[in-house]
């Protein structure tokens, strides 16, 4: 039987570290609602507090770089919604949460719903650029979906009247705030698509709080805007207000007035462009006419100076002159060619190459014979001289001397030894005999005294 596996043994440090990693990796980031208590802010600028409900509580920390983005001062007993990461403070083993953002409970819940819906629709690709429809340029009719009593409608109509008074506008009045507003906005969008009277829609309202603008964060409104066959320009609130409708719409305008600017043409600017184009066209026509008139005058003058009858007469005279010159030149050329042919025929008859060829062949044969004889004599003499040189060379060759029993000894530097003083004891010598070399070492040096000859 296999021995049972021993249970893992943790140190306290390892246990706390393992629990912290499990909390951070498994739980991730969460939204938590609760009541603030025990709120403190030390000199470091960090916030420390407890978040609790009726039956439980948890310690919280919000570091300075995160709490600087909070737009209110947390109070004891205040209900809030926080976005936080769950962790464990390892030195004490305290379970706590690290808060990243904080909002009052009312706005916080709405913001949470906003983020959840935004993530959902984004996952469905409703915000993708590939689904955005281009706006008509220019628009022939504008539809406006907003409150008939709101300031947004007044701003839109004022801008359209100023920029393009002739542009038709169709108003689809609807409530933009309250529980019934999302349904009314959806029906207005669907009605505009059914009637198909306009080629662009402005959907929006004036500014307000998050609750006031909440109708444009409704999922039904977002899907109706996405499904609209008519391009939709969202114009909700002020430039800092961003709603779900802005992401789904084909174009977001920061304000209702800006939306009117986008869908309309500036009539005054168009008039200035037309006037400028007209002036350029008139200048171009004047220049063209003046240029054509000047060209016509030049051509007319040239026609007067070069009447066809006069030109034909001059051309006829020139043609006759050229014909005479050509006939004279042709006759002279034929005469010169005939004379040259006669001279060449005479020279050819006088200089028949056959005799020259015969003499040249005879001369070549003679030269060949003389060359062969000269080479034979020179080769014989050269052979004789070579034999004499070989005989002489063999007579004076050192090898012949070696063959008679003599030898040649050289030092290590290759010099031939003539006297004993050229070497020292212990040096290596090389001796050449008739049939090879001998390597030897100098053991002893004994000079031979020369005997003096007696003079009688």
UniProtKB/Swiss-Prot annotation:
It comes from the Bacteria. GO terms for biological process: DNA catabolic process. Its EC number is 3.1.11.6. Keywords: Cytoplasm, Exonuclease, Hydrolase, Nuclease. One of its GO terms (molecular function) is exodeoxyribonuclease VII activity. It is found in: Cytoplasm. The keyword Cytoplasm applies. Pfam families: Exonuc_VII_L, tRNA_anti_2. It is an enzyme of class 3 (hydrolase). Coiled coil: none annotated. It catalyses: Exonucleolytic cleavage in either 5'- to 3'- or 3'- to 5'-direction to yield nucleoside 5'-phosphates. GO terms for cellular component: cytoplasm; exodeoxyribonuclease VII complex. Belongs to the XseA family. Bidirectionally degrades single-stranded DNA into large acid-insoluble oligonucleotides, which are then degraded further into small acid-soluble oligonucleotides. NCBIfam families: xseA. Heterooligomer composed of large and small subunits. This is Exodeoxyribonuclease 7 large subunit. It comes from Shigella boydii serotype 4 (strain Sb227).
